[in-house]
């Protein structure tokens, strides 16, 4: 799998649709426009399962847990786990904002305030994705607590990524494996 212009190539997955262009955007407006138009439902189907697993692990361990989201993209699983949201609501939010004149910096500020306005579950989420713009956005708005931006199919984990993974209790994925 070769990297080109900071995105990932779809060659190993020729049967799958290629969404390279939406993962190189500096914010999630195009991501939600495209995937929302395809009736993308995997995160919604998985969120209650993830929430139940998290609750069970917290009860078992007696402490907040740490989650790794493989293929985290712009943090949609984190948003759905942390807050009473669904994919359609996020999609509508970003489609509505798509035609605004907001810069990415302004959208980051708006989203940071939006997500901070909800009661927060004491949970650490590490996002892992090949898209630096996507993980940077998710981290900047507070959806993920740490980011690993590496192509794990081509390179071994660097030390900072290994450090970020210490103490992970649960690994989830809807964007890298489920489709």
Regions found by a protein language model. Give the residues of each.
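A short SAM/SAH-binding and catalytic strip from SAM-dependent methyltransferases
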Residues: 168-179
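Conserved acidic residues
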Residues: 65, 145, 166-169
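Conserved S-adenosyl-L-methionine
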Residues: 68-71
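Class I SAM-dependent methyltransferase SAM/SAH-binding core
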Residues: 75-156
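Short amphipathic alpha-helical segments, especially helix-boundary/capping motifs
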Residues: 23-28, 108-113, 162-164
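Class I SAM-dependent methyltransferase Rossmann-like catalytic core
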Residues: 2-66, 76, 80-97
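A short acidic, Gly/Pro-enriched loop at the edge of an enzyme's catalytic core
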Residues: 158-170
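Short helix-terminating capping/connector loops at secondary-structure junctions
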Residues: 60-64, 116-122, 164-165
